[in-house]
Amino acid sequence: VFLAGRSEESETSETPLMKDAAVKIYRIRTGNFTRMSEYIIGDPRFSSIRHTHKDMIFAWTKKEFSNLSRAREAGLTVPQPYAFDRNILVMEFMGENGIAYPQMRQILPGSPEETYNDAVGIIRDLYRKAKLVHGDLSEYNILTGPEGLILIDMAQAVTLEHPRAYNFLFRDIANINRFFEKKCSVCDPHELFREIVGEEFFEL
């Protein structure tokens, strides 16, 4: 990920303001094809793509743009996506003065109990409001910003129609529990899963 300046018109001035943007470039030759295909194949949004390495990389880039847009529209705190082209994604830089905000594993924004509840809230809101499952959630892809937790790395996130969406959801819950279980009391993962998806899921 590279840091770049982005010109943005101010609502109160005709003078463009420079706003930092992150440019993420997925390498076509070294991308993990097997890992990507696990999340792309089965996602109805990408059912028509060819399963070549290059097309998978391009779909992966488009997928992150789409997932970030969807999560942001649902009210989650994620980087704002600006544009994408083939294997290049431009989005909001989450940091200050060119320095990225720390990962949650490095700094908690509040007490362990409060932060755990906030992290669980991210999983819940992503599922209920954005109708997405992150699929690879951990203390490494949640940042601690000045106003709380920020969710990043959304390329692998899947819609609820993906055949493995609920396996991924349980894994996300288990990963967050693993990180917090030595810091505070955590919910039983099966009970938390049931609470997030709702009782109607088990009545299908």
PLM regions and their residue ranges:
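Conserved ATP-binding subdomain of kinase catalytic cores across diverse folds
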Residues: 1-100
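Short, glycine/acidic-enriched loop or turn micro-motifs at the edges of active sites
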Residues: 27, 95, 139, 144, ...
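Short acidic, glycine/proline-rich loop/turn micro-motifs
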Residues: 35, 101-106, 161-163
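Conserved kinase catalytic-core helix
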Residues: 51-78, 101-135, 140, 145, ...
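Proline- and acidic/polar-enriched loop/turn elements at helix boundaries
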Residues: 83-84, 138-139, 192
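Structural motif
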Residues: 87-88, 141, 148
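Active-site catalytic-loop/activation-segment of kinase and kinase-like phosphoryl-transfer enzymes
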Residues: 94-102, 156, 180-181
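C-lobe/activation-segment region of protein kinase-like
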Residues: 111-115, 119, 127-134, 145-204
